[in-house]
Structures are given as C-alpha cells and as structure tokens.
C-alpha cells in the first residue's frame, strides 16, 4: 500500500510540474522516458530499489521533455537523419537547464540524483574512467554534473555551444 501511495504521489507531482494531465506509468525498464506523442512519462521499477533521489531526478528530467520537447523537433531530427544519441544528449542539456530555471529547487534534486546514479555506475563508465569516453558522452556527463570531465580547448568550443542552447532548432543545428 505504501509503494502504491508513493507512485500516486510521484504521478501527481509529475502532472503538476508538467502543467498537464500526462499519463505516468511505473514498469520494469532500464531508465525513465517521456513519450512526446502519447504524453506518457515512464518511471522505472528496478530489481535494486530506486532511491528517492534517483526517482525525483527522473521526474524532473522527463517533465522537461513534456514542457519543452516538441513532436516537430523529433520529426525534423528524423527527416534530417540526425544521430539520435547526439540530439538526445543536447536536448537533455537544454531542457534540464530550463527545468532548473523554472524550478530552482530542482537544482539540488538533479545533483543528488545524478550522484546516486553515478554511484551505481548507471552511465557505464566502470573502472575505465571518464577520460575513456568519447566527446559526446563526456559532454553528457559534464551536463549530468559528473566531476572530473575534462575537455581540450577545441572540445570546449562544443561544450560552450551546448551550454548556450535555447531553442530546438539550435539543438538540431
């Protein structure tokens, strides 16, 4: 009963933050998602219990897609045959910046949530370390507040561009 009440509370909070009556589901899967077309937010149920920090992070992140990622952007990306992972990483950086602006209290939720995910090696870095990752993955980790992500001067140009993203068109360019 307590678990069902917690799921219902997260669902209500997600709807309030998203400012619409999105459909929230909890199911066994690797990560959270937001289906733009169906207006559905999926939260994972993991074999190892998901922490409050991780779940709050995922809610804050996915409602960012509900608020600021349009179906038009998804369609344009597909038409232009852009790399989905690149677009998703850049869009994640953009929408998380917007969530933090709109809901300043979310800044600490993101930090605590990403710290918890990193502790369980959610990002699959393992013993190799951040320096073994390619540029786009390091950019992703940088925006996920992972400490120790370093960039060359040339790479910093791309990080700076990502930090300045404000529109969907800028993400796609």
What residue spans do the PLM features occupy?
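Short, functionally important secondary-structure microenvironments
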Residues: 1-173
